[in-house]
Amino acid sequence: MSEQEKPIFTISVLVENKFGVLSRIAGLFSGRGYNIQALNVAPCEDPAYSRINIEVQEENEKLNHIIKQLDKLVNVVEVVDFRNVPTVYREVVLLRVRFGDKMHDIIDICNIFGAKVLDATHDTLTIECTGGVSRISRFLNLMADYPIDMLTRSGKIAVIKPKDNGPKPEAD
């Protein structure tokens, strides 16, 4: 199976917020030849713990193996596989774009996607856009028509949807 044919999965790993934990997790991936597509780490609801969201492009069987290996690591509290549970995904992109005489066009695109202009200079705008992965991709496809000086993406972050039948989240 080629790299393009392999699906991209998101795994969430709850870990003790201790020195070396991220290094051991990254080492597990690199030692087995698995490539991490995106990685996001931050303290969570309890500052003694961090949540690591990892995007990996791999076959199902190999992903199952990765999850089992992660579960065995010291300081790993919980591994969540988002493949079979209802999940809310979001991504954040920050970019700095040169606008020339197209500032209003860029702001129109931002308004369509609910993006925010965070900073402006005489020739650049710094923009934040948050949403589902396909929404971010559509936003970036339109922004590609303008000179982008710098771009950074968070990668997917995820939480499991609650089991109640409350209000539906906004569509992607």
Language-model regions, residue ranges each:
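Long, contiguous binding/interaction regions
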Residues: 1-50, 55-172
